[in-house]
Curated annotation (Swiss-Prot):
Protein name stated in the entry: F-box protein At1g47056
Molecular function GO labels: ubiquitin-protein transferase activity
Domain F-box: 37-82
PANTHER family found in the cross-reference section: F-BOX_LRR-REPEAT PROTEIN 8-RELATED, PARTNER OF PAIRED, ISOFORM B-RELATED
Amino acid sequence: MGQSTSAAGNSILNRRRSKSFTLKFPIESIESEISQPDYTSSLPDECLALVFQFLNSGNRKRCALVCRRWMIVEGQNRYRLSLHARSDLITSIPSLFSRFDSVTKLSLKCDRRSVSIGDEALVKISLRCRNLKRLKLRACRELTDVGMAAFAENCKDLKIFSCGSCDFGAKGVKAVLDHCSNLEELSIKRLRGFTDIAPEMIGPGVAASSLKSICLKELYNGQCFGPVIVGAKNLKSLKLFRCSGDWDLLLQEMSGKDHGVVEIHLERMQVSDVALSAISYCSSLESLHLVKTPECTNFGLAAIAEKCKRLRKLHIDGWKANLIGDEGLVAVAKFCSQLQELVLIGVNPTTLSLGMLAAKCLNLERLALCGCDTFGDPELSCIAAKCPALRKLCIKNCPISDVGIENLANGCPGLTKVKIKKCKGVLGGCADWLRTVRPMLSVNADTMEQEHEEAASNDVVGGSQENGIEFPQLNSQIMASSIASSSRNRSGYFKSGIGLFSGMSLVPCTSRQRRASR
């Protein structure tokens, strides 16, 4: 009897469950939604690809899982690809580049603890990416000169080549220069294998006419690239970071031909006034960075200012050497009337040079001073009274006080942003007062309490970025134009709206919209 009662109860319960399930999820409704047409099927592949270009990488991957057509369209229209270049990547190359057969920008990065791809993998990639325009290699230590030579022969349309922390040598870079006639940008960082190479072994090759930008960083024998720098007929940008050796003679040889260089960046380089005097013959120079070059003095800066009258952007990190000061800055003010951005770190200007800069450089919009022991309230008051075009001002670790801030509030009518950091004489209440007096002014200032907290954190981290100052780049044609990436041209409004569709099916949405209209 107990068993029969239990069976009867279970049957009743099952009928109730099935009834409730039928009421909540009618089968007819599910079938009607499935039978609705896919309105995206009439959308041309070109339009679908255009929609994909507004999505980030994660959303594009999700869209590729919707159906086979979307996966094909997404793969055929992906031009930028970044891969972990571990050794096991070689097994995935055929399938990977069969799907992404239109890649023009490729980044191969490997971490320090893994074994990177070798020559065989790089050659396979080059055979499947004949139209490659940009290649970036990071920590691919298994690559050799042989692999780079084979790659250069297969990808002759390369425009941008960047490599860092790799172990191939000068012959690999030379192969790229000898085969890629359209090469515009060359960036070499932390490469080994240059110790026994004579400088004449690396020339510009077929890239002599196309090369526009050269960046060398942390190279033991970077002078090997001297013929490349001198032989680049249309060089516009030269950046040298922490490369050993004396560079005065090389810069003299480069400037003698004056190819129209508009940007030079020298950081922790062994250069002197001899090099600066040579750079002064680059009459088209618009941007100059002198960062921790202790042998450069007022004489070299004055020589550049006198002949480079188009200078618009000047960054000087004097490294507290006190070799660049009022004399050099007065020359800049006298001859460089188009100056728009000035950054002084470890330099000691006074009202003499600052007053001249304010009076002569009427287009000065961005000014930053860091660790300037002579920049006090009189200097700040001078800037406030004489710089009507100034828009952005950054002061860090300078002996200013609340008096200077009060004078700043009454001057610089075009000022939109002020940043004050580690200035012990400025109290937090003064910054709040400045926000009240100038409500349209963006004020970024630390209080005394925040200053002590930052000092403690810098002691833990090491304070390596104590003097870091950033400004947006000028709207000039300093760098050679590269192929525009689809991700750079996204519309922010459309991107935020299309993000709502990530992770959901578009077909049921269209069917529900049609049913609602009925």
